[in-house]
């Protein structure tokens, strides 16, 4: 594929879109490329998989057809939108889940119960250490599992434990 032009666009919702023009022989007039891009971006913004934004995508436009009378911007915008939807689904996209580093300070008496609760939340225990009569648990936990953790931790320990969390990564 011969690359004629490449645009890298920073997306408002994070990530990038790389748009590559590899059209040869005038199969599609260059004036319709912005309409194709607009259709693709509209579909990316709607989220073709779960309703959440698609990001970090490379699009290569290499062929197409025009009609001297019926070709217009709306037709190419819809074509870009539909082509993106089809290609996106065929690519087998994966949904990434936000995972957080969680640090729990807990009295030693409650350590087992707190560890059991964390493991029930799909936590991966990364380590432990003792500090001033408290055990410090380090774990990686999916954000989805942390919605009621404060209440649960307080209930398990009688309000004697605390925790902090910060974003770590996105994982499958």
Please provide the spans of the model-predicted regions.
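Accessory interaction regions appended to the cores of large information-processing enzymes
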Residues: 1-172
């Amino acid at each position: 594929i011969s690359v004629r032009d490449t645009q890298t666009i920073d997306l408002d919702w994070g990530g990038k879109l790389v748009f590559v023009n590899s059209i040869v022989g005038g199969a599609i007039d260059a004036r319709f490329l912005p309409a194709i891009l607009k259709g693709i971006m509209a579909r990316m913004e709607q989220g073709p998989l779960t309703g959440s934004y698609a990001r970090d995508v490379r699009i290569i436009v290499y062929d197409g057809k025009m009609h001297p009378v019926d070709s217009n911007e709306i037709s190419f915008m819809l074509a870009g939108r539909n082509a993106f939807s089809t290609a996106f689904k065929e690519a087998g996209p994966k949904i990434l889940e936000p995972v957080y580093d969680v640090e729990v300070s807990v009295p030693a008496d409650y350590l087992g119960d707190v560890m059991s609760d964390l493991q029930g939340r799909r936590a991966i225990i990364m380590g432990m250490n003792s500090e001033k009569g408290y055990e410090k648990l380090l774990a990686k936990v999916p954000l989805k599992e942390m919605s009621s953790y404060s209440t649960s931790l307080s209930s398990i320990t009688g309000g004697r434990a605390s925790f902090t969390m910060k974003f770590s990564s996105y994982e499958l």
